[in-house]
């Protein structure tokens, strides 16, 4: 189902999703068990959506166990009934569980059908995802007023279940929650790329030592970029894309997240997916790096000159996406997926 964590939907889930989209159910609770998405419980409507909401949703929320809940509204769009997607990640749940559910969220939405999901609500306490909490969420979405400190904290957690902690004394960034620092060597390489002293930086996660380290800074031309993508392990890449556009010479920094699918362990896929947003936030916020485009690929063959150009200078702007999947050669691709970056809250999102 997804290369982000390797979690797949059971056949029962797929069948129930199909019936749910036709309006049969009011609520579905989905959990991860034995590396599969499974249905924990489901309910049929008994009243209007707002009268059903609290009595259906709140009893299903466990204090130490994340889950997903799909709650059907009474309204419809062109694709059918509209749904609320609730991501429940309680404060007292295990960090590994938080990471796993965060990294699998996009794949569940894709399996269900993103066009059916009207709103997404994230919660760490029941008040966040109660009917009152949902109405507050709707109000905050329609209001131009700035977020409160608590709302901003929840927004950041929604992006990923790990927080960023800047070490003032050590001058390196720490991914709190999974406690993966960026090595000084890697951080300095990113600074050099931002100052145009390098044109390529590759980072990897040293899983054993729990640190993001520098893997490669080889001077790289566009034609050589596919060769930099490992076939058996995940990597983060920052590439200075030098090109011309409408008569102007441009140097654009592109972020590439390469994940070769099931040749990587589930833990590796989970960690790379979970750490990605925080890494980008550090780079963009602390280094003031202007990352023009964020791309996810399965293999280096997808990085053609035409693809990079079209991604940096898209012909249509109907729907802006933080991460974009390349079209790639037929037969060489895994399942398509979209992943959101930190600069764009999951309003589009693995």
Swiss-Prot record:
Post-translational modification: Phosphorylated on serine and threonine residues.
Known tissue expression: Expressed at high levels in the colon, testis, ovary, prostate and lung. Expressed at lower levels in the brain, bladder and heart. Not detected in liver.
Entry-annotated residues carrying Phosphothreonine: 349
Disulfide bonds: none
Modified residues (Phosphoserine): 143, 277
GO biological process: actin filament depolymerization; barbed-end actin filament capping; negative regulation of actin filament polymerization; positive regulation of cardiac muscle hypertrophy; positive regulation of neuron projection development; regulation of lamellipodium assembly
Pfam families according to UniProt: Cofilin_ADF
One GO cellular component, as annotated: myofibril
Keyword Nucleotide-binding among record annotations: no
Membership in a protein family: Belongs to the actin-binding proteins ADF family. Twinfilin subfamily.
Function: Actin-binding protein involved in motile and morphological processes. Inhibits actin polymerization, likely by sequestering G-actin. By capping the barbed ends of filaments, it also regulates motility. Seems to play an important role in clathrin-mediated endocytosis and distribution of endocytic organelles.
Record-given protein name: Twinfilin-1
UniProt organism field: Homo sapiens (Human)
Gene that encodes the chain: TWF1
């Amino acid at each position: 189902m997804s290369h982000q964590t390797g979690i797949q939907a059971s056949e029962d889930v797929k069948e129930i999703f199909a019936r749910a989209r036709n309006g049969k159910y009011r609520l579905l609770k989905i959990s991860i068990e034995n590396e599969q998405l499974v249905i924990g419980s489901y309910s049929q409507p008994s009243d209007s959506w707002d009268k059903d909401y609290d009595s259906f949703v709140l009893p299903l929320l466990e204090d130490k166990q994340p889950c997903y809940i799909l709650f059907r509204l009474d309204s419809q769009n062109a694709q059918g009934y509209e749904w609320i997607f609730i991501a429940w990640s309680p404060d007292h749940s295990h960090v590994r569980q938080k990471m796993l559910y965060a990294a699998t969220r996009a794949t569940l939405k894709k399996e269900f059908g993103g066009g059916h999901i009207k709103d997404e609500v994230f919660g760490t306490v029941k008040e966040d995802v109660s009917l009152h909490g949902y109405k507050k969420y709707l109000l905050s979405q329609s209001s131009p007023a700035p977020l409160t400190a608590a709302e901003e904290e929840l927004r950041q957690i929604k992006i990923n279940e790990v927080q960023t902690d800047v070490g003032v004394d050590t001058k390196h960034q720490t991914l709190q929650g999974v406690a993966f620092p960026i090595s000084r060597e890697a951080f300095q390489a990113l600074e050099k790329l931002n100052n145009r002293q390098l044109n390529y930086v590759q980072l990897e996660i040293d899983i054993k030592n729990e640190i993001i380290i520098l893997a490669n800074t080889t001077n790289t031309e566009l034609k050589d970029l596919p060769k930099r993508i490992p076939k058996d392990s995940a990597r983060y890449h920052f590439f200075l894309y030098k090109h011309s556009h409408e008569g102007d010479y441009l140097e654009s920094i592109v972020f590439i997240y390469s994940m070769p699918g099931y040749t990587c362990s589930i833990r590796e896929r989970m960690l790379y997916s979970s750490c990605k947003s925080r890494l980008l936030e550090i780079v963009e916020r602390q280094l003031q790096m202007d990352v023009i485009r964020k791309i996810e690929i399965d293999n280096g063959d997808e990085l053609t000159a035409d693809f990079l150009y079209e991604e940096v200078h898209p012909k249509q702007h109907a729907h802006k996406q933080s991460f974009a999947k390349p079209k790639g050669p037929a037969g060489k691709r895994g399942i398509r997926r979209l992943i959101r970056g930190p600069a764009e809250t999951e309003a589009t999102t693995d």
